[in-house]
């Protein structure tokens, strides 16, 4: 099995899921979709099963508990690589990542980079020229910009939008990342993955996207999540400067965390 896989993690996204999946399938008809649901009490998982039953390109992973965005992505990456998908895309369920812009990410992936190699990871960026946000309050924009800038400074990253979640990976490049060493489950997962991608020597580029605030449902973001991410980034940065990076955290949440595999193969 080959082709593009768009991974959509969900928790209480019943109001948004069907529209997002339909837009992905319209924007990139050849792509498959994997919904990774953390036992949403609002019935998102049941809706995902209905979508999979109606469309053979839609698949579902049901996880037995809410274990964080990072754990959901890590399990889905393992599944995608086992099934032979390439490339692998991250996309939010709430409509904030516009599926209509996915072709621009996929087009850049695999093209020559500035060093004469191939682009391994494309990030849809809000903070490069041409990128933008819609309907965000000023304080949230400032917080996001600060988070990216702080991660860049602490970890010596080149990426302008280090916390962005709209990403496309080449499968071969993802295999070079030590996914078993990516332990972050919450907001800091995107930075953790980016840092590991850099350490693995991946070629990373950004393309401009428009990030749109959700119009239905509640955001999962909170001050506690942001603080946790900042603490982790600080610890990683200090360890990278003054000693070996050590992560005393649980291993990959994909192990034993799924109640069922895919609804459709």
Give the role of each language-model region.
Residues 15-19, 42-51:
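Acidic helix N-cap motif at the loop->helix transition within catalytic regions
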Residues 30-40, 62:
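Short beta-strand/loop segment that forms part of the nucleotide-sugar
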Residues 37-46, 95:
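A conserved acidic beta->alpha catalytic loop
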Residues 4, 31, 57-59:
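Short, conserved active-site loop motifs that form the nucleotide-linked donor/cofactor pocket
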Residues 61-82, 99-187, 214-229:
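Acceptor/aglycone-binding surface of glycosyltransferases and processive sugar-polymer synthases
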Residues 1-3, 156, 180-265:
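Hydrophobic helical membrane-anchoring modules
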Residues 85-96:
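Short beta-strand-to-loop acidic/aromatic patch adjacent to the donor-nucleotide binding site
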């Amino acid at each position: 099995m080959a082709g593009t896989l768009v991974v959509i993690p969900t928790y209480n996204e019943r109001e948004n899921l069907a529209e997002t999946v339909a837009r992905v399938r319209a924007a990139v008809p050849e792509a498959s979709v994997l919904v990774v649901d953390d036992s949403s009490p609002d019935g998102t998982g049941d809706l995902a099963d209905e979508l999979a039953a109606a469309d053979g390109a839609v698949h579902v992973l049901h996880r037995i508990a809410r274990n964080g965005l990072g754990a959901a992505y890590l399990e889905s990456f393992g599944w995608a690589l086992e099934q032979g998908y390439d490339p692998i895309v991250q996309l939010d369920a709430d409509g904030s990542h516009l599926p209509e812009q996915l072709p621009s990410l996929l087009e850049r992936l695999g093209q020559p980079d500035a060093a004469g190699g191939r682009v391994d990871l494309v990030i849809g960026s809000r903070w490069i020229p041409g990128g933008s946000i819609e309907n965000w309050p000023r304080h949230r924009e400032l917080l996001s910009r600060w988070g990216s800038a702080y991660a860049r400074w602490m970890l010596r990253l080149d990426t302008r939008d280090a916390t962005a979640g709209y990403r496309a990976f080449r499968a071969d490049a993802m295999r070079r990342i030590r996914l078993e060493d990516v332990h972050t489950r919450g907001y800091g997962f995107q930075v953790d993955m980016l840092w590991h991608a850099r350490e693995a020597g991946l070629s990373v580029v950004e393309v401009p996207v428009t990030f749109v605030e959700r119009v239905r449902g509640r955001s999962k973001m909170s001050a506690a999540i942001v603080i946790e991410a900042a603490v982790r980034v600080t610890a990683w940065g200090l360890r990278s400067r003054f000693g070996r990076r050590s992560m005393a955290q649980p291993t990959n949440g994909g192990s034993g965390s799924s109640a069922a595999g895919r609804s459709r193969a």
